[in-house]
């Protein structure tokens, strides 16, 4: 971000706007000004809020730009990461955690309805799977999941992502298949790049674990 800020004069208007928005979340100044007690690996609620607020006008300004849409949706999701939906333990009823959940789902679905390109946009499909996997209707994300099965075969995490929906709708075979493909994609990536970072190892292990978990539910002992 510091480098981006230093060369903004050579960037397009869109690029400048995105750099400024990202600087509210990732710049050294923003990090230094954040409450140290809330920082977790550079992450904090106040920085996430600042970024989401900075992206809101850009979503309006660049209406129809699918990349901007994806960045805004992700910014909204990070306000309540993995807590977009609440489940009542007594009744099992699942409801949106807050209005931001409804907003980001509406934004994604508006994009899909407005543009055929959006329906195959990797980031939008990825985010839609995450947005609905713990919702009352994960099956609505099946078309997005199906896109990700083959859209970017070299990116292990995206190859794996359909299983986040498959598992909730009982498509165990499909979940197993896409995770095996994801493991193979990860292996190819490591062979080509030599990247063995601990963070990437976690993602690789997640795919292996998903294969075992889904095979267990499907009774596929040999898998």
What residues fall within each predicted segment?
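Amphipathic alpha-helical segments of tetratricopeptide repeats
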Residues: 60, 109-113, 145-150, 183-192
């Amino acid at each position: 971000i510091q480098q981006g800020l230093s060369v903004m004069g050579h960037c397009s208007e869109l690029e400048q706007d995105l750099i400024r928005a990202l600087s509210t979340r990732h710049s050294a100044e923003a990090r230094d000004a954040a409450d140290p007690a809330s920082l977790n690996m550079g992450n904090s609620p106040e920085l996430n809020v600042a970024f989401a607020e900075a992206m809101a006008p850009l979503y309006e300004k660049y209406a129809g730009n699918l990349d901007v849409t994806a960045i805004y949706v992700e910014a909204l999701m990070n306000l309540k990461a993995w807590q977009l939906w609440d489940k009542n333990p007594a009744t099992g009823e699942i409801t949106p955690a807050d209005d931001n959940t409804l907003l980001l789902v509406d934004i994604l679905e508006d994009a899909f309805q407005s543009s055929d390109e959006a329906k195959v946009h990797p980031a939008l499909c990825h985010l839609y799977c995450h947005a609905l996997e713990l919702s009352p209707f994960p099956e609505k994300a099946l078309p997005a999941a199906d896109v990700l099965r083959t859209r970017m075969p070299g990116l292990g995490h995206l190859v794996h992502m359909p299983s986040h929906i498959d598992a909730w709708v009982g498509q165990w075979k499909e979940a197993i298949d896409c995770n095996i493909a994801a493991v193979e994609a990860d292996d190819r990536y490591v062979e080509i790049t030599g990247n063995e970072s601990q963070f990437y190892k976690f993602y690789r292990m997640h795919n292996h674990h998903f294969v075992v978990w889904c095979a267990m539910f499907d009774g596929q002992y040999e898998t």
